[in-house]
Design a protein with these regions (language model features):
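Bacterial N-terminal signal peptides that target proteins for export
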Residues: 1-8
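Buried hydrophobic residues that stabilize the cores of well-folded domains
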Residues: 20-250
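C-terminal motif of bacterial Sec signal peptides marking the signal peptidase cleavage site
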Residues: 15-18
C-alpha cells in the first residue's frame, strides 16, 4: 500500500478524532470526556512513555466550551518530524470538522475533513496529503438503530481498497470491528473492545486472521480527586508497555 493508504489503515481504527484507542461513532462523548476529563478542564498535557525506550512523546491539547479539541501540539521524540501542530475548526451549521496538521517548518502535513449527518454521526471523512495532494475518502453507512456501520475507503481514483464493519454500544463506542483489505479480498483482522462503567477502554483484542494470532491489550486508569484521569497504563500480552500521564494546565 502507498504511504497514505498505510496511514488510513490505522486511521480507520482510530478515525473519530479522539485520543482514545477505539473508533467513536457519534460525538455523544466529547473529546474531553473520551480522555476521562471533567467539564472544567480547558488545557492538558499528555505524556506518553514507552517502557523500552528513553524517549517520550508530549502532546498539548486545548478544548472549547463543548469539550471539543481546538488545538493539538505534539512533540514526538520518536519520529522524524518532532513537532506537529493541528488546528481544529468546527462549522456547526454545515456539520463539519476540519483538522489541519502542520510540520515544524510550517508545511502542511495533512488535512482531515469530517462531515456529520443529522444524528451527529460521522458520515464522510476525507484525508488529504499536504505534499502529494493524494486523497483518501471514507464513507459510513449506519444501521437504522445506529449500532452498526460499514465504512468504505477509496483512493483518489475512486478505487475501493478497505472495508470496515463496526458494531457500537449505546454510548457510541466500538465493541467490535472487522477490517477487509480489498486487494487481498480477505478478512484481514478483527478487534474487540471492552469498557468500564466510566466509558474508559479496559481491554482490547486484535485477531490477525492471516497470521492467526491474537494480541491482547489491557488498560488500567487512575483518577484524581476531581475525577480527572491522571494516568493510563497499557499492557501488551501481559507486559507493561506504555505509561500515559495527563497533567491539567491552569
Amino acid at each position: 500500500m502507498k504511504p497514505l493508504k498505510n496511514l488510513l489503515f490505522f486511521c480507520v481504527a482510530a478515525l473519530f478524532f479522539s485520543c482514545q484507542h477505539t473508533p467513536q461513532r457519534p460525538v455523544e462523548m466529547s473529546d474531553r470526556q473520551i480522555l476521562g476529563l471533567t467539564d472544567k478542564v480547558q488545557q492538558v498535557t499528555l505524556i506518553s512513555q514507552h517502557i523500552d525506550e528513553e524517549k517520550r512523546d508530549t502532546t498539548f491539547l486545548t478544548f472549547d466550551s463543548k469539550g471539543r479539541m481546538t488545538e493539538k501540539i505534539e512533540h514526538l521524540q520518536r519520529t522524524k518530524d518532532s513537532i506537529l501542530k493541528t488546528k481544529y475548526v468546527y462549522d456547526d451549521a454545515q456539520h463539519t470538522r476540519l483538522a489541519q496538521t502542520y510540520k515544524s517548518d510550517g508545511t502542511l502535513l495533512n488535512e482531515e475533513l469530517a462531515t456529520y449527518n443529522a444524528y451527529n454521526f460521522v458520515e464522510k471523512y476525507t484525508l488529504t496529503n499536504g505534499e502529494t495532494k493524494e486523497v483518501i475518502t471514507v464513507v459510513f453507512n449506519y444501521s437504522a438503530d445506529g449500532l452498526k456501520a460499514e465504512a468504505k475507503a477509496t483512493d483518489g481514483k475512486g478505487e475501493l481498497f478497505l472495508t470496515s464493519n463496526i458494531e457500537y454500544n449505546p454510548r457510541g463506542q466500538a465493541v467490535k470491528e472487522e477490517v477487509y483489505i480489498t486487494k487481498d479480498k480477505k478478512h484481514s483482522y478483527t478487534t474487540y473492545y471492552v469498557y468500564d462503567e466510566k466509558g474508559a477502554l479496559i481491554d482490547k483484542k486484535d485477531y490477525n486472521v492471516k497470521e492467526k494470532n491474537i494480541r491482547n491489550y489491557t488498560f488500567t486508569h487512575t483518577y484524581d480527586n476531581a475525577g480527572n484521569k491522571k494516568e493510563e497504563r497499557i499492557y501488551i500480552d501481559g507486559s507493561l508497555s506504555i505509561i500515559n500521564k495527563t497533567e491539567i494546565r491552569k
